[in-house]
Amino acid sequence: MTFSVDKVRADFPVLSREVNGLPLAYLDSAASAQKPSQVIDAEAEFYRHGYAAVHRGIHTLSAQATEKMENVRKRASLFINARSAEELVFVRGTTEGINLVANSWGNSNVRAGDNIIISQMEHHANIVPWQMLCARVGAELRVIPLNPDGTLQLETLPTLFDEKTRLLAITHVSNVLGTENPLVEMITLAHQHGAKVLVDGAQAVMHHPVDVQALDCDFYVFSGHKLYGPTGIGILYVKEALLQEMPPWEGGGSMIATVSLSEGTTWTKAPWRFEAGTPNTGGIIGLGAALEYVSALGLNNIAEYEQNLMHYALSQLESVPDLTLYGPQNRLGVIAFNLGKHHAYDVGSFLDNYGIAVRTGHHCAMPLMAYYNVPAMCRASLAMYNTHEEVDRLVTGLQRIHRLLG
């Protein structure tokens, strides 16, 4: 199938609107991607004609809703090449998935004197849960430092592991720098030291194929809303043997086998024992539609288009005076920058006046901001629906801001 950005854009209603009297150039998909009509319609159709509470219902609507939900679990397992659909837990998003691992597996396996390794480029969602776990149990948090070019100082990694290392928690792709980490090398090293590996895939799964079996990671987590799906839904993958050993971290309906006031409670099997309460079934249906949509386009086709667009953007941005770019030349999805000494918020506000949506701030990565000694950065994201013309508008806008502000 030949990739056509014009055909893709036609599927996204919001891309036809104007902002401040100008066509919208949406360069903020790393924060949250827009939704195609196929996703919007699938979720709306479920609520119009198919909604019911899932699990245990004997009536037709409930049985059909349950089947649809479990079919999405199967589709998601194929999307990341898991061995079994029962290795996937529905979560609210990447943040909840990481917290689930920290509170279930972490509480059961990390003890005083143990250590967990993260990196200096992590999103707060892959820092704070581990800080909280370490504080609870008396463990140590170790950090892989950054290089100025936005890559990790991987030569330091072997020195961080020891017999007390329980986990390496690492981002697949940096949400600020676009750096893609060499996961196979890092995961192999971690396993040689007897440590498990959690991968934050929130910024990876929309850009190219992900194969959790080839990676051999123990945990992989991502969000639906960055993958052109709904908010409030994501996937946590856990190797089956690990998942079966993990205790539930939330209690309630749907995750129990039996409940007795005198004899206590027993749990249902994984993954359902990690899905307490009424699930976000509509969001799950929408996620399934998003997975179907990107799979039909072909992730390899998407990757080729986006990489060509990224190379074009980086070359064109060289013409902007006083522009500082952060991150390596080879990157995925995002371009972080500052313009002269102007605050990122000011630059972002000017761009918004030109109909260009970028993200400004610390991007939930304060340790990374501290490393570069800046309070904030602008970040332009490039997704499969962005165009060369939108890149040109960004470049022209930045040149104009430089002339105005000096």
Swiss-Prot record:
PROSITE patterns: AA_TRANSFER_CLASS_5. Pathway: Cofactor biosynthesis; iron-sulfur cluster biosynthesis. The lineage of its organism: Bacteria, Pseudomonadati, Pseudomonadota, Gammaproteobacteria, Enterobacterales. It is found in: Cytoplasm. The active site is at C364 (cysteine persulfide intermediate). It holds the Pfam family Aminotran_5. It comes from Escherichia fergusonii (strain ATCC 35469 / DSM 13698 / CCUG 18766 / IAM 14443 / JCM 21226 / LMG 7866 / NBRC 102419 / NCTC 12128 / CDC 0568-73). The modification N6-(pyridoxal phosphate)lysine is found at K226. Homodimer. Interacts with SufE and the SufBCD complex composed of SufB, SufC and SufD. The interaction with SufE is required to mediate the direct transfer of the sulfur atom from the S-sulfanylcysteine. Its cofactor is pyridoxal 5'-phosphate. One of its GO terms (biological process) is cysteine metabolic process. Cysteine desulfurases mobilize the sulfur from L-cysteine to yield L-alanine, an essential step in sulfur metabolism for biosynthesis of a variety of sulfur-containing biomolecules. Component of the suf operon, which is activated and required under specific conditions such as oxidative stress and iron limitation. Acts as a potent selenocysteine lyase in vitro, that mobilizes selenium from L-selenocysteine. Selenocysteine lyase activity is however unsure in vivo. Disulfide bonds: none annotated. Its EC number is 2.8.1.7, 4.4.1.16. Keywords: Cytoplasm, Lyase, Pyridoxal phosphate, Transferase. GO terms for cellular component: cytoplasm. InterPro entries: Aminotrans_V_dom, Aminotrans_V_PyrdxlP_BS, Cys_dSase_SufS, PyrdxlP-dep_Trfase, PyrdxlP-dep_Trfase_major, PyrdxlP-dep_Trfase_small. It catalyses: (sulfur carrier)-H + L-cysteine = (sulfur carrier)-SH + L-alanine; L-selenocysteine + AH2 = hydrogenselenide + L-alanine + A + H(+). GO terms for molecular function: cysteine desulfurase activity; pyridoxal phosphate binding; selenocysteine lyase activity. This is Cysteine desulfurase. Belongs to the class-V pyridoxal-phosphate-dependent aminotransferase family. Csd subfamily. The keyword Transferase applies.
